[in-house]
Amino acid sequence: MRIAILGWGSLIWDPRDLPREGVWQVGGPVLPIEFSRVSRDCRLTAVVDFEHGMEVPTRYVLSPRVDIDDAIADLRIREDTVKRHIAFLNLQSNSDSAASNAHHRRACEVVRTWLGPMDFLGVVWTALPSNFRSETGEDFSVDAAIEYLNGLPCSAKQNALRYIRNAPVEVDTPLRRKLDELRLL
């Protein structure tokens, strides 16, 4: 079974030990993405966010795995997360992660439509939710995100901005545009 891995952030420019075949391809499903998740090291990371995200094309790469559970495990290890934060679709068994990952139900629908004409029987992607409010006490907005970034110590702020700067050019979100306009990227 051919399995695709979807990416839109550091997975592309810093895949680390993620097993994959070939290079990242443009033409993945269009998903609403925004830098609305605060990571452990204070970066704002790009996540699927149906409330604040901008529809952007994602990328994909072939997994060397033939079993969807192995591809899920690979991505889970790379992302240093739990299994429920890895979404999947398996056309061979007609199963997906929508039931176990309610906030990604709509993403499953979008990815299923994209998968239709593709030469893959499965796909996996990171399904971390936005946590901006729980981490900062503020609802996510471009202004709140900039305020958050400006409140970081210098080295943490530079690391956070580097993450946004290194994202693929097509990940053109409102926050990224504003940071570019302010010449912070």
Tell where the protein language model's regions lie, with residue ranges.
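A glycine-rich, hydrophobic/aromatic-adjacent loop/helix-cap motif
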Residues: 1-185
